[in-house]
Amino acid sequence: MIMNLEKLLDSTFNCECGRSHNVPIRELIYAEDALEQLPGVLSNLVDGRRVVLVADRRTEEIAGLRARQILEEARWSVHQIIVPDDGRGGPVCDDTTHIWLNDRMPSADIALAVGTGVVNDLTKWTAFDKDVPYAVFATAATMNGFTAANVAPIINGVKILIRAQAPSAVFAIPSIIVDAPFELTTAGLGDAVAKPISTADWIFNHLFCGESFCRYCSEIINSLEPYYLDRPGDIIDRKPDAIKALFNALLYSGIAMTIIGTSAPASGGEHLLSHTLDMMSSVDGALHDLHGRQVGLGTIFASALYERIFKIDKPVCHPYSDNIDSKFWGPLAGNVRREYKQKIPMLKIICEKLDDGKTWYPFLTNAQKLARPPAQIKSCLRTAGAAHTFAGIGCSRERLLTAALHMHQIRKRPTIIDLAWILGIMPSAAGEIIDRWLTD
C-alpha cells in the first residue's frame, strides 16, 4: 500500500530501505480550473512575479495563450518562448536546442513549461542551469518525466541521462488530458507498462551489481496498474478514471525516480530500444515515433527475453565483446564507446556471480514475480490502441532488428539486454522475438 499523492507531496520520510526520501514537489493541481489556480499557486512558490512561459506551437494553442492571459491579468510579468520544431514534426531535447533556449531565457523568478516531454525536459534543464525553480502545466499523459528530476537529452548524438530538478508544482486539466491526441496517451501507456520490467532490471542490478534497491519505490504504482493493464479497453474509450489512473501512474513513477536519484525505478533495458532508434534518427534523419510508443515495443522485447531467461536452470557465460560496432555508430562511435567501456567491469562481475551460482536463483525468484509476460503486455497495448508492432511505429523490420542488436552498447548501466548477450540468448533471439511478438 502506498501513500496517497497529496500526503506524498512536499514530504520527507524514513524508508525501510534505510534511506530518507524527500519529495520536493509541493503542489499537484488536477482540476478543470487548474489554469485559474496558476497565479495563486505560483505566488505561494516564489516571492517575485516574473515567469518565463515555455511552450511549442501546439501547446501554446492548447493552454499557453490562456495561461499567459491569466497570469498577466494577475499582474505577473510573462516572458513567453516558443520552442521551434526541428523539421520532423516537433521540437527535440538535445544540446543544440538547450543552448538555444538557454540564450533566450531571461532572468526570472520561476519557469513554467506548458506541454509534455520535450518542452518539460528543456524547461526543467534550462531552469536548473539558471538556478530557477520551475513548474509544469501538462497537456497530455504522455510520459513519466513530469515529476522526475531527470532529463534524457541527446548530447553529442548520444541519448544520456542527466540530473536536473523536479518541478515545484504540476498542473493539469482533466478534460485536456482525456481529450489529448490519442497517440500521446498511448505513448504514456507505453511508458507505464514498462514499470514491471524496469523493476525486474532493478532487482538484477541490485543482486548482481550491488545497486541500491528500494521496495517502496519499486511498488509505488502497483495499486494503479489494474486500471490500464487489466482494463486497456478503458484507455481507448478514454474513460476518465482510466486516463487519470494512467496519469497518476506516470506521476508516481517520476516521483520514484526523483527520490531515488536515478531512473532505475522506471527505466531499464526495455527503454534502450527507443533510445537507440532516436539516436539512429539523429544520424540519418529518418523519422521516429514518440518515446513511449517505442518503449512499448521495447517492453514486449525485454519481456520476451525474460521469458527465455527464466527457462535457464544453470547459466553459462558466453564470450561478450569488449567494444562497440564503430562502423554502425559512425559519428557517434566515440561517445557510445565511452559509455560502453564503463560497463565492461560490471559485466565481468556479473559473469563471476553467474559462475558461482549463488545469485541466480534469488534473481529468478524475484524477477519472476515482477516481469509481465510478453503476451499480456502486447495484448494490453493492442487492446488500448497503442503501438505494438514495428509497423505501428513507422519502422521497418530491418531497422528495428538493427536497433535491437546494438541497443546494449549505449549505456554504462547493465540491463537484461546485457544478460541476454552474456547467456548466449542474443543475438539469435532478436529476429525471432520481432517475428513472433512485434510483427502483427
Where on the chain are the PLM-derived regions?
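ATP/NTP phosphate-donor binding region
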Residues: 1-110
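C-terminal charged capping/lid subdomain of soluble metabolic enzymes
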Residues: 2-15, 192, 308-440
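Solvent-exposed alpha-helices and their adjacent loops that cap or buttress functional pockets
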Residues: 20-22, 45-46, 103-106, 127, ...
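Gly/Ser/Thr-rich loops at beta-strand to alpha-helix junctions
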Residues: 32-35, 57-64, 115-120, 141-142, ...
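Non-transmembrane, aqueous-exposed alpha-helical and coiled segments at domain scale
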Residues: 89, 94-107, 141, 260, ...
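A short, small-residue-rich loop immediately preceding and capping a beta-strand
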Residues: 104-126, 130-140
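A glycine/threonine-rich phosphate-anchoring loop and its flanking beta-alpha core
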Residues: 125-227
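Active-site segments that bind and position negatively charged phosphate/pyrophosphate groups
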Residues: 220-368, 372-376
